[in-house]
Amino acid sequence: MTNIVWHQHPVDQAARAEQKGQNPVLLWFTGLSGAGKSTLAGALERALFEAGFHTYLLDGDNVRHGLCKDLGFTVEDRDENLRRVGEVAKLMVDAGLVVLSAFISPTREERDSIRARFPVSQFIEVHVSTPLSVCEQRDPKGLYVKARSGEISNFTGISSPYEAPLAAELTIDTSKGDLVTQVRALIDYLTAINVINADKAKALA
């Protein structure tokens, strides 16, 4: 690594952000399988996109079709999966985008490691705190049934622990209220911290 140096681009993050008229940020949605992470992140992205924001949604299942298709579900592979996603998200934020990432990301250490790569104002942890009982009842992919039967090992929430965030910027239980209200809470927060400026906030009203 001693012969590898960081190449400084002539166009920096600030210039890209100014061109897009937005403040780049990473929203990291974490929670159990079936908690509603992808649904919530997708609905927020749609709202932001329609209001003129430049966005991208990184989804836990989708990245395993390409970027992380060589990885399994051992502890080491899960760590590497999130490390790669964190690096990609950082590049996207540097490109001036509003990035939404929906991953179980079960340990605080994993999430804190990704947080540490970003300025304080550019990492927002969203804990989708839907209870296990609700997630298991939903079971959209049939994974809890397989985990309970022993067909899937090391399944978060059943045979592997989930460490809830201690100080997430936002906590949303998708079993309470409706999706519109939940997305509104996210938009209000982003407006309060000036990720969404006053002009674009009107388009989201």
Swiss-Prot record:
Pathway: Sulfur metabolism; hydrogen sulfide biosynthesis; sulfite from sulfate: step 2/3. The keyword Glycoprotein does not apply. InterPro entries: APS_kinase, P-loop_NTPase. Transmembrane segments: none annotated. It catalyses: adenosine 5'-phosphosulfate + ATP = 3'-phosphoadenylyl sulfate + ADP + H(+). SUPFAM superfamilies: P-loop containing nucleoside triphosphate hydrolases. Keywords: ATP-binding, Kinase, Nucleotide-binding, Phosphoprotein, Transferase. Its EC number is 2.7.1.25. One of its GO terms (molecular function) is ATP binding. ATP binds at G31, L32, S33, G34, A35, G36, K37, S38. The active site is at S105 (phosphoserine intermediate). Disulfide bonds: none annotated. It is an enzyme of class 2 (transferase). It holds the Pfam family APS_kinase. The keyword ATP-binding applies. GO terms for biological process: hydrogen sulfide biosynthetic process; sulfate assimilation. PANTHER family: ADENYLYL-SULFATE KINASE 1, CHLOROPLASTIC, BIFUNCTIONAL 3'-PHOSPHOADENOSINE 5'-PHOSPHOSULFATE SYNTHASE. HAMAP family: Adenylyl_sulf_kinase (MF_00065). Catalyzes the synthesis of activated sulfate. Belongs to the APS kinase family. This is Adenylyl-sulfate kinase. It comes from Shewanella baltica (strain OS195). The gene is cysC.
